Amino acid sequence: MRLGVEGLETGYGKAQVLFGVDLEVREGELVALLGTNGAGKTTLLRTLSGLLRPWRGRVLWEERDLSGLSPAQRARLGLGHVPEGRQLFPLMTVEENLRLGAAFLAPGREEEGFARAYTLFPRLAERRRQLAGTLSGGEQQMLAIGRALMGFPKILLVDEPSLGLAPRLAEEVLLALKRVVEEGVGVLLVEQNVALSLEVAGRAYVMEHGRVVLQGQAARLLEDPRVREAYLSL
């Protein structure tokens, strides 16, 4: 399965944010999307998931144009989204939050989804009856990812999963995403920790002012002097 964009342009009101963006992610690969605040990364993810309409260009699921499809319809196709800020229901338990991610599953697959989430994040199993609002920041991020995985997505969009986390927890979350990829899921990762992102990703795109300015193998970009100077302070 391939999720791609061709010549994508969009924005808010009269303010254009994305300018002719081309990008793709396939099942079984982790692709990092890098850039400073305001580069357009979150806007791109919101457009991919159907929360924002493109002005021009196309969002493609294989060769199918997703124009006009709602976020719910895209989720049914297999497109998952872990938004920035987690957006959990704090007065619901871990298990209840996870169950919300299974809304589009065929009957009988919910338990399979729980098993998958709890295997990936054993800490969630230990706290399954605990209110989400009482979890630590790292545990809440694990829950947000687990909820998205309950729908068995083919492609998963993940926005700033390590935001506000201690370095050890940030690494734990990104390594968990790498295990998700090993199961065959494609992940498009927006992440502030550029060095760690490039270590776990196979490919990467770099955005500036709403445009893709660099792309390629993550290992090569990690050694690119422009990336090292702009994002790694080297």
Per-region residue spans from a language model:
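ABC ATPase C-loop
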Residues: A148-L149
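ABC-type ATPase nucleotide-binding domains, specifically the catalytic core motifs of the NBD
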Residues: G13, L69, V94-E112, L120-A125, ...
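Conserved ABC transporter NBD signature motif
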Residues: G57-D65, L77, E110-F114
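Helix-to-loop junction immediately C-terminal to a conserved catalytic motif
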Residues: S49
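The feature captures the beta-strand-to-loop junction immediately N-terminal to the Walker
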Residues: L34-T36
